Amino acid sequence: MKKKEKKDYIFSRLDAVLKPEGYKSFKTGGDPTYVLNSDDMAVYFFMNFKDMGYVTFSSLYISIHIVENILHSFCPYDDSVIDKKKYFPDTIYDRNIKVIEGYRRGIGYDIEEKSQLEEFTDWVIDYLENDGKQFIETYSYLPNVLKRMDELTIEGKVWQNNEVGILSGALDAQLRGLIIAKLCNDN
């Protein structure tokens, strides 16, 4: 299948589900992105359509604006990259997504036939309507993020652990965590 056919099919299905929810799509560039932005946060995900046939799906990111604004006030990022339309600094990231059989993390899902395209798209939509929606509902509330951070600490894991963590970033994740704790009046 051609890359354009894959994009057309996936975007038409995603648009039907996400546009009524208020998502905006940015379908140009190497990382087509869907964004739901509000006064408090931006929820987004992106995809990559690779020349070798693979399609990747990022799972959900949430940028909690108050956290990122505080962090940005003393730890600036490159404003030319973070445009707050398509690109946001990410506060949290859903690392616990259940991937479809045949999906290779970091590489994607190889789509050569219509049935594979349908299966991949169904998986993305199912995630967005179920586990993804639950992720947004749970972690758009800062005390729930703090609770997960506390659980990770008890388990001896860093907040941005690659397999089960909740916060995005590297060293800046620690700053995000401290900001979240302070906003939740945690000592």
Regions found by a protein language model. Give the residues of each.
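Intrinsically disordered, low-complexity regulatory regions enriched in serine/threonine/proline
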Residues: 2-7, 35-187
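Amphipathic alpha-helical segments
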Residues: 3-27
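Long, charged, glycine-rich C-terminal linkers/tails
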Residues: 26-34
